[in-house]
Amino acid sequence: MSKTVNVGDGASYAPQSISKPVVEPGEFCFAVAYMDHGHIFGQTNGLLEAGGTLVAAYEPSVKKRADFVACYGEIEFVDEFSKLLDDPRIQLIASAAIPNRRSDIGLQVMAAGKDYFTDKSPFTTPAQLEAVREACQTSGQKYWVYYAERLHNEAAWHAGELIKDGAIGKVLHVTNLAPH
């Protein structure tokens, strides 16, 4: 089960792709935390469509938890974020926290030996970028960013196909001006 597309609301726009699992069930377990932006639904859809197994979640807001359960069914919600960090099943934590908190959450995730998948923008200061860069180098963990307008946007994918097919000539530059 996954969230359906809501084209009228860019903040919760969560397209679904053709499912193309690249892992077996239970082979790649992930969790979701801090559902402050609707892109968490697109992030979750993408991970599920790739074959990932959603094993747990953390979200302080009762309403946001209910919205998530309405889309994905019953899921184990933990009462503290640290429980996700301590769970040995979890290989990656996806998050759409408030932007200025994203890097700090990612640093905690990587320090716990897990990869991190955050919504954009991933940083709000140069110091955050440097801290994450250093943590990636020392931990070996990944800090991935969900650019929905590139990864989950039919127009962007179609443009990519047109470019690949040579239908629009030689492309010198692409600029994406997102709605928010």
Which stretches of residues belong to each language-model region?
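A contiguous active-site-proximal alpha/beta segment in oxidoreductase catalytic domains
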Residues: 123-180
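Histidine-centered active-site/metal-ligand motif
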Residues: 37-39, 102, 115, 180
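Short, well-ordered coil/turn segments that N-cap beta-strands
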Residues: 27, 52, 75, 91, ...
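Alpha-helical elements of Rossmann-like donor-binding domains used by nucleotide-donor carbohydrate transfer enzymes
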Residues: 42, 67, 83, 92, ...
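Residues embedded in well-ordered beta-strands within globular domains across many folds
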Residues: 58, 94, 172-175
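Beta-loop-alpha module in the N-terminal Rossmann-like domain of NAD(P)-dependent dehydrogenases
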Residues: 72-135
